[in-house]
Design a protein with these regions (language model features):
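Helical (often loop-to-helix) elements that flank the catalytic cores of nucleotide-handling enzymes
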Residues: 213-223, 285-304, 329-361
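Flexible glycine/proline-rich, aromatic-decorated loop/lid segments
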Residues: 317, 321-335
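Conserved small/polar residues in nucleotide/adenosyl-binding loops
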Residues: 366-372
Length: 373
């Protein structure tokens, strides 16, 4: 299974693809929206939708979906075909800017945190143009153009995890720009970035199928300790078994095709535990990619005779699976605000930014930072 240069990012409607397929004026206006939140004209949206549809069709896509993150901690999608009836018994393929920007899925069966009744069905998905669309292939099924979106109620309340994330990124941007003005600096934007490491367990499928608790809950609920655990620290960074290495190779190929910058892979501390880590990216994009990564982990594991466990503590007595987040904030002209420099104790800008973050954590998580009696 060879990975060629043409495979890298081929299923992602990334900036390079947009630049190549969109008229220059359209690409320029879309970039203003992506980078600085400028309003998106309907004509621009129509042009983007046409280019996105043609690109997806070339990859074999027959359907599209507004892909979002409801409060289930999973992703959600409803597939609509590109086919529209003309009226004389024939069909045309169509995908408009209106369909790209907004859809109205039934929100009554999604959790809402108690903010509305079940009969309040209407929900809206709205395109997050800052996160690249991608084409997902369903084994033995259709190929689907997935458009990252937010999910809100008719009255504007957030019904997903992504809307608060985007709002928090906007708040960080505004306050960071305010602080930087005190130092005489005037960048146009400050962006939060994150590189989430993903730990997971691979269990042989025949062993997995013998455990009803693993099948139903993704973790063991009872059982004896393993004959050999992690006492010798010989699993961590150890030689990767051939079967696992084959799985990782197939996983990387799929991730690279999606444009996910998977970089590092290794054995973790516990037996049968492993890790994959991508290069950091803009926070909402990295979050979308992590959801897609977890879905891909499970699918590739299935194809290779494994079950992939993503539960944070699937086995007692050995390490659980964390998701370390390498987080930072950076200006649009390339300055990392959490870079301490050679003399951090004299770097007033770094100290102020760090103090603001510590203060925010202290205020938000008082129960974790203050002693209890």
């Amino acid at each position: 299974m060879e990975v060629t240069a043409e495979d890298l990012g081929k299923r992602s409607f990334c900036e390079a693809v947009m630049r190549a397929r969109l008229p220059k004026a359209v690409f320029k206006e879309l970039k203003k929206t992506i980078d600085y939140g400028a309003p998106l004209d309907a004509a621009i949206a129509d042009s983007v939708a046409i280019a996105m549809r043609e690109w997806a069709k070339e990859l074999g896509a027959t359907h599209y979906t507004h892909w979002f993150h409801p409060l289930t901690n999973l992703t959600a999608e409803k597939h609509d075909s590109f086919m529209d009836p003309v009226g004389d018994g024939t069909f045309i393929t169509e995908f408009t800017g209106k369909e790209l920007i907004k859809a109205e899925p039934d929100g009554s069966s999604f959790p809402s945190g108690g903010i509305r009744e079940t009969c309040a069905a209407r929900g809206y998905t709205v395109w997050d143009c800052t996160s690249p669309a991608f084409v997902k292939e369903i084994p033995d099924g259709c190929k689907v153009l997935c458009i990252p979106t937010i999910f809100i109620s008719y009255t504007g309340e957030s019904l997903d995890h992504k809307t608060p994330l985007l709002r928090s990124m906007d708040a960080v941007n505004k306050q960071a720009l305010r602080i930087l003005k005190l130092f005489g600096k005037t960048p146009a934007k400050v962006t939060a970035s994150v590189g989430p490491e993903q730990e997971y367990f691979l269990i042989d499928k025949d062993k997995f199928n013998q455990r009803l608790d693993l099948k139903l809950t993704g973790r063991t609920l009872f059982g004896a300790p393993a004959p050999k655990g992690q006492e010798l620290d010989d699993q961590y960074f150890g030689v990767i078994k051939d079967k696992v290495s084959h799985f990782m190779r197939e996983l990387n190929k799929d991730l690279w095709e999606y444009g996910i910058p998977a970089k590092t892979q290794h054995n973790e501390v516990a037996p049968s535990q492993h890790e994959i880590a991508p290069i950091y990216g803009t926070t909402n994009v990295a979050t979308d990619q992590n959801q897609l990564l977890m879905e891909t982990l499970k699918k590739v594991a299935e194809r290779n005779g494994f079950a992939c466990l993503l539960h944070e503590k699937p086995f007692a007595g050995v390490n659980g699976s964390g998701k370390h987040n390498n987080w930072s904030i950076t200006t649009d002209d390339g300055i990392n605000l959490l870079e301490p420099g050679k003399t951090p104790h004299e770097n007033v800008q770094f100290l102020l930014v760090l103090t603001c973050i510590l203060k925010a954590v202290a205020v938000s998580y008082t129960h974790l930072t203050l002693p209890t009696t």
